[in-house]
Amino acid sequence: MRTSQYLLSTLKETPADAVVISHQLLLRAGMIRRLASGLYTWLPMGLRVLRKVETIVREEMNAAGALEVLMPAVQPAELWQESGRWEQYGPELLRLKDRHEREFCVGPTHEEVITDLARNELNSYKQLPINFYQIQTKFRDEIRPRFGLMRGREFIMKDAYSFHLSQDSLQQTYDGMYQAYSKIFSRLGLDFRPVQADNGSIGGSGSHEFHVLANSGEDDIVFSDSSDYAANIEKAEAVPRESARGSATEDMRLVDTPNTKTITALVDGFQLPIEKTIKTLVVHGAEEGTLVALIVRGDHELNEIKAANQPLVASPLVFASEAEIRAAIGAGPGSLGPVNLPIACIVDRSVALMSDFAAGANIEDKHYFGVNWERDLPLPEVADLRNVVEGDPSPDGKGTLVIKRGIEVGHIFQLGTKYSEAMKLNVLSEQGKPVNLIMGCYGIGVSRVVAAAIEQNHDERGILWPSALAPFQIALVPLKYETESVKQATDKLYAELTAAGFEVLLDDRDKKTSPGVKFADMELIGIPHRIVISDRGLNEGVLEYKGRRDSESQNLPIGELMSFITEKLSR
């Protein structure tokens, strides 16, 4: 491809509304353009990258035995009403009516549509298991679209849905999708981690997320420094660093603690180690009208998802108001603790191993110091309630935990029978009895992968594409292309490289565009290999080569260039 026949829309300045680096570079490299909030047009350069992601995804899904379909983006409300999600989904679901006043939505996901397809097309156990996938545009009406492709309103996803008679069958397909996803992200050249995850609003049981590691990531992911253990921060199991509770060395005593409403005030005001303090948080109980106290160590944070999963606790999690707390306990936040607590209580594992600790006395402006379990009060229910912190033991007993930022680009779920029961999807078993099908769901944010790749691979000059994603493999930059010798040599090399199957962008812009601008554009776009053809080099029988990740260029004999490039691109 020649730049004279191509849309090369690079920008020198960074648009003011672009915050994250992927958004900045996608705009500056001429890959996307904003149409409206959260809506983007893919320009030719960016579309080449997007299509490469789609190709790899499609190849691995086909290899895993999934069948490609294409479902409508606009979906009838009746299907969402059947599943119960029409009322549940919230304002992110863009709803509309046609001229006949029939209600529809623009699909943020396709569980209802695929379940409807399956109940119309599947009628026998002999057709199972089966796995359908599509690569389709989705729409979620985000309240604040931001970060370009990272959190837009319209985006492209690969979503797959599998159907099974048994949990064992689902597990086999789930494991196959896990392997397929690992192959996809490996082929894309990304540094990623598959992590145990919570199912969220989709529902179901088992779940893994696939995260691209990047400092700009929105999610904290946790993994062992000595094993394959990995989970997101919501799911990661918090193992206490202590193996046993220490012995009591203090008597419990009541202490006046005026104006001490925070852990920081308690620690600073009374010279206490923060590890000897606790936080008591009060939430609504699962039984209507009840409250439950959740207690974590002063230097730890409550994990709200773990808390909401406790049988005694209402889900979704609702924190009690100060008025509710005072009515039930007789004291307000900042003075709460487990001693003589009149409501149900759950303590974190680390709290259960504490000794000689300080706790609110459930009396305004008073704390107990020197509190010890069993001696001063019985140990209540114990559960994993907190977020892990870096350096915690790995739950598998191998190494310690490291926390890094990640960008979620894939998610696989074991949905169970949530949708098949709601929408009456069943087939006849081998015994002739109707059986609700068990489902799996597997998504990849195809357009988000493009942004995530940039977040992980860039420098001060522009994008550093993994080789599988670069829009072109080679940039040919002739100096003084209007010179006959340079033009002939460039055209000959261009023909040889394209005939060999390489993707080449020939920068044949005229002399009004300086060599420096051409070099800067090719680096901004992120083309991995640059070859410069000049009169001086031709006279010396060499061409200048520079890899996008190289600090220095090198001169290569003209006759060796093809073998050199072939070897480089075959790695």
From Swiss-Prot:
InterPro entries per the UniProt record, alphabetical: aa-tRNA-synt_IIb, aa-tRNA-synth_II, aa-tRNA-synth_II/BPL/LPL, Anticodon-bd, Anticodon-bd_dom_sf, Pro-tRNA-ligase_IIa, Pro-tRNA-synth_IIa_bac-type, Pro-tRNA-Synthase_IIa_type1
Domain remarks: Consists of three domains: the N-terminal catalytic domain, the editing domain and the C-terminal anticodon-binding domain.
Keyword Protein biosynthesis: yes
Cystine bridges: none
Subcellular location: Cytoplasm
Full protein name: Proline--tRNA ligase
UniProt family annotation: Belongs to the class-II aminoacyl-tRNA synthetase family. ProS type 1 subfamily.
Single GO BP term: prolyl-tRNA aminoacylation
Function: Catalyzes the attachment of proline to tRNA(Pro) in a two-step reaction: proline is first activated by ATP to form Pro-AMP and then transferred to the acceptor end of tRNA(Pro). As ProRS can inadvertently accommodate and process non-cognate amino acids such as alanine and cysteine, to avoid such errors it has two additional distinct editing activities against alanine. One activity is designated as 'pretransfer' editing and involves the tRNA(Pro)-independent hydrolysis of activated Ala-AMP.
